[in-house]
């Protein structure tokens, strides 16, 4: 998948535990774990905004994009 989730990196930088973040933004630890691992098909903007607010970061600090040849073929 070309979208890279760096949430675990940001949590470590901010010294915040997953449980703390999940409680603060109102989602389950299980859902946060799925998001951290990239095993989700999408994330709501509201959830992303809440994460960024709590961790004092930007969406680009959490999400990245890695281009691949397959992406170019799919665009054709």
Where are these regions (language model features)?
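Residues within the helices of the helix-turn-helix
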Residues: 8, 19, 49
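Short, charged recognition helix plus adjacent turn
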Residues: 9, 63-76
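DNA major-groove recognition helix of helix-turn-helix
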Residues: 36, 55, 66
């Amino acid at each position: 998948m070309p979208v890279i989730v760096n949430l675990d990196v940001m949590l470590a930088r901010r010294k915040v535990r997953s449980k703390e973040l999940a409680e603060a933004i109102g989602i389950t630890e299980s859902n946060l774990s799925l998001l951290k691992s990239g095993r989700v098909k999408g994330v709501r903007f509201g959830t992303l905004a809440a994460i960024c607010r709590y961790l004092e970061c930007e969406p680009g600090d959490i999400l990245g994009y890695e281009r691949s040849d397959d992406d170019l073929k799919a665009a054709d």
